[in-house]
A protein has these predicted regions:
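Structural motif
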Residues: 1-8, 55-56, 102-126
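Flexible loop/hinge segments that line or gate small-molecule binding clefts
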Residues: 17-57, 163-175
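Short acidic capping loops at alpha-helix termini that bridge into adjacent secondary structure
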Residues: 69, 101-103, 153-158
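An alpha-beta-alpha
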Residues: 58-99, 201
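Hydrophobic alpha-helical segments within soluble ligand-binding/sensing domains
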Residues: 47-72, 112-120, 180-198
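Amphipathic helical "hinge" segments at domain boundaries
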Residues: 1-13, 88-94
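Flexible loop/turn connectors
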Residues: 120, 125-133, 137-201
């Protein structure tokens, strides 16, 4: 329905927060489009934060806590998303410093309510794990699993979340996290889109 609405020129432009259609579908809309954290097509601007810096900050947090076996959990499976770079940088930094880092791709096809079960399976599979890096929602489930297994947080299990969402701020035990500059990203998205709209006119 929203594609029909856009094709009938009921909107002046689009900010893509999620990628749902084929690239050609967006290009055929003939509307100004800006994407958040996903490279839809060469002619569609992509706005994203400094994921390399985010990966370095997260790795630094792990290194200063002398962790031995770290799980690097990503829900990103494509190079089209710049966010995959934070996990690459994180993993490379730990390995260069002699820390065991296991790179794991999260099954995003599962429902959110099934994340806890998937996390429990990870703890069973990697009993030597003493730290984890991932997005806030996944880390929240990790903290719950670790606590229920009697692990002392953060002495026995260290986590670093990424995004700085409300979930991270309300987490218990409290979560260490890297915040994305949400306001700056939003301002840039709107600014770029308005320039495209005005340019088109």
């Amino acid at each position: 329905d929203y594609i029909k609405m856009m094709r009938e020129n009921m909107v002046d432009g689009i900010i893509l927060g999620t990628h749902m259609l084929a690239e050609t579908e967006y290009q055929n809309l003939d509307l100004p489009i800006v994407a958040l954290d996903y490279r839809v097509a060469e002619d569609i601007p992509t706005i994203y934060s400094d994921h390399n810096k985010g990966g370095l900050l997260a790795a630094g947090e792990i290194l200063k806590n002398d962790c031995k076996c770290v799980l690097n959990v990503t829900a990103v499976v494509t190079d089209k998303s710049p966010s995959i770079n934070r996990h690459r940088v994180f993993s490379e930094t730990l390995k260069k410093n002699g820390v065991k880092c296991i790179d794991y791709t999260w099954d995003t096809k599962q429902k959110t309510e099934d994340y806890y079960q998937q996390m429990n399976e990870l703890f069973d599979k990697y009993p030597e794990m003493d730290a984890m890096f991932s997005e806030d929602l996944i880390i929240m489930n990790a903290l719950k699993c670790a606590g229920e297994r009697g692990m002392h947080i953060p002495d026995e299990f260290k986590t670093v979340g990424y995004d700085g969402t409300l979930i991270a701020k309300m987490s218990y035990p409290s979560m260490t996290y890297i915040s994305q500059p949400i306001k700056e990203l939003a301002d840039t998205l709107v600014d770029v889109l308005l320039k495209k709209i005005n340019g088109a006119k």
